[in-house]
Curated annotation (Swiss-Prot):
Region (Disordered): 1-22
Entry function: One of the primary rRNA binding proteins, it binds specifically to the 5'-end of 16S ribosomal RNA.
Keywords for this protein: Ribonucleoprotein, Ribosomal protein, RNA-binding, rRNA-binding
Protein name, as recorded: Small ribosomal subunit protein uS17
Entry GO terms, CC: cytosolic small ribosomal subunit
HAMAP family recorded: Ribosomal_uS17_B
Annotated gene: rpsQ
The protein's assembly and partners: Part of the 30S ribosomal subunit.
GO molecular function: rRNA binding; structural constituent of ribosome
Similarity field: Belongs to the universal ribosomal protein uS17 family.
Pfam families per the UniProt record, alphabetical: Ribosomal_S17 (PF00366)
């Protein structure tokens, strides 16, 4: 079974989560912090509000900058806080 592909193994394990968010920090080497916003409804008052999650992601080529809109996907833990990696830069900051 040495000829099995890694894509086939990854598909068998299930889909990986992906998020789209804005880069809020790029001061580290090969790492960025991405702020992902989502809308949540209050359980009692039914009003919608925004919640922000800050994800640390691996940026191998240091290509993402502050304010860029990026797509990240989950991966194996790379450090204590970093378990996502940069997939693509959707839109560069102006």
């Amino acid at each position: 079974m040495a000829s099995s592909s890694t894509e086939g193994q990854a598909a068998a394990r299930g889909r990986k989560k992906s998020w789209t968010g804005k880069v809020v920090s790029d001061s580290m080497d090969k790492a960025i912090i991405v702020a992902v916003e989502r809308r949540v409804q209050h359980p009692v008052y039914k009003k919608y509000f925004k919640k922000t999650t800050r994800l640390m992601a691996h940026d191998e080529k240091n290509e993402a900058g502050m304010g860029d809109l990026v797509k990240v996907v989950e991966c194996r833990p790379l450090s204590k806080r970093k378990s996502c990696r940069l997939v693509e830069i959707v839109e560069k900051a102006k």
